[in-house]
Amino acid sequence: MDIAQLLAADGVVLRSGASSKRQALHTVADTAARALGLNENRVLESLLEREALGSTGLGSGVAVPHARVEGLERVVAVFVRLDTPVAYDAVDDRPVDLILSLIHI
């Protein structure tokens, strides 16, 4: 499967002013909610629950937060590029500026 097939319509943010991990995840949730007609708080809560299990910061400035939103049956991706890297508890302790989020809907 091509990643372009996973990207939600309007699921790309090339310039986010988020200045913290939580704000970055809020941007992901907002983008997914608007693109897919979902409740933003529901998406954000799912992302935060998953992050509480362990950081999804892969290193080299990349994070792959993911979540399952109950009742939905496909996987969609949201891409966010931050203007300024943020602390993310990544495995290499480097800040993150590229976020590819997978939402199972």
Predicted regions and their residues:
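Cytosolic covalent-transfer regions centered on His/Cys nucleophiles
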Residues: M1-I103
